Design a protein with these regions (language model features):
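Active-site residues of response regulator receiver
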Residues: 8, 52, 79, 244
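Active-site beta3 strand of CheY-like receiver
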Residues: 44-50, 55
Length: 346
């Protein structure tokens, strides 16, 4: 059975977590400081680590940086709050995912199992997970095309975030390519062979939103003559992209928050929750902090979503890409004899 390292200075919490893992059959190693945890990582076989971000002396971020040079084990970070700057930095440093204290048994099992599966499928070369998205870009209209410095920073964050299962939040005006970035995150992740399911939350009537996302059982409501799978289960094993989440009704936002916390859904009309194995990526063109202040968006969901934020600059701020994009679309749509821009047009 897998060997799990817990690094946390709270002895009572550490023992409770260790007992939970031992009940599941795992071998547990414990440490209360970054130095002690790194020592165990150097001297013992470890398959995954669960590390508190807030540790005495050198914190969990230091552990992440140094652990990456010792062993490519997936690290699950523990946070006392739904999100924050340290959580974002941890994901950028390569943390596999994060859990918010108090940790539920269901969330722990689901996250740890994903981490161990990822570790089993990760090549020995640690650079493989951080390869440039361009290396896997298709030529089918869904690739990212840019030479601007602003977009190079986006590409870098895609490379850092792709191999994590953390929720990603893509921000940008309409037309900046938010779905293309979501597809790049999926394509460069360990879920690339799984489905990518995109949902435009702004296009679904409020009364149909829950059935669309979570599915329903036969007879759940008038007109439900058959069972519906729902988008979450359609995306099982892959990525669910919720576009324009800023337009989602408050009632549905509460259920999305529960999915992020528990990794399970309850179809409309069902009596029992069902586990789901999906990475959630969301996007919006709206100002979510303002929506939170106005009561149109849940503050707790907002904090849960901004673990890995990516902001996309509009084309007017990267004018050097205009010619590049024009030539790209001419090649894409030109068939066997694509046209080229004349010198005058360029």
């Amino acid at each position: 059975m897998a060997r799990i390292l817990i690094v946390d200075d709270d002895a009572a919490f550490r023992d409770s977590l260790a007992e939970m893992l031992q009940d599941l059959g795992y071998t547990v190693l414990q440490a209360e400081t970054t130095d002690a945890g790194l020592h165990r990582l150097r001297t013992e076989d470890v398959d995954a680590a669960i590390v508190d971000l807030r540790l005495p002396g050198e914190d969990g971020l230091v552990f992440l940086r140094r652990a990456a040079r010792i062993s490519p084990v997936p690290c699950i970070m523990l946070t006392a709050y739904a999100s924050g700057g340290n959580t974002i930095e941890a994901m950028s440093l390569g943390a596999f995912d994060h859990l918010t204290k108090p940790v539920t048994r269901a969330a722990l099992i689901e996250t740890l199992e994903r981490a161990l599966r990822r570790a089993a499928n990760t090549p020995d070369n640690p650079q493989a997970a951080g390869a440039s998205p361009a290396a896997k870009e298709p030529v089918d209209g869904t690739e990212l095309v840019s030479s601007s410095e602003a977009m190079r920073q986006v590409f870098k964050r895609i490379g850092l975030a792709a191999n994590s299962d953390a929720t990603a939040l893509i921000l940008g005006e309409t037309g900046t390519g938010k779905e293309l970035v979501a597809r790049a995150l999926h394509r460069n992740s360990g879920r690339a062979t799984g489905p990518f399911v995109a949902v435009n939350c702004a296009a679904i009537p409020a009364e149909l939103m829950e059935s669309e996302l979570f599915g329903h059982v036969k007879g759940a409501f008038t007109g439900a003559i058959t069972e519906r799978t729902g988008r979450f289960r359609e995306a099982d094993g892959g990525t669910l992209f919720l576009d324009e989440i800023g337009d989602m009704p408050l009632a549905t936002q509460a259920k999305i928050l529960r999915v992020l916390q528990e990794r399970e859904i309850t179809p409309v009309g069902a009596n029992r929750a069902q586990p789901v194995n999906v990475r959630i990526i969301v996007a919006t063109h709206r100002d979510l902090p303002s929506a939170v202040k106005e009561g149109r968006f849940r503050e707790d969901l907002w904090y849960r979503l901004q673990v890995v934020p990516l902001w996309l600059p509009p084309l007017r701020e990267r004018l050097g890409d205009v010619l590049l994009l024009a030539e790209h679309f001419l090649r894409l749509l030109g068939g066997d004899s694509p046209k080229r821009l004349s010198a005058a047009a360029a």
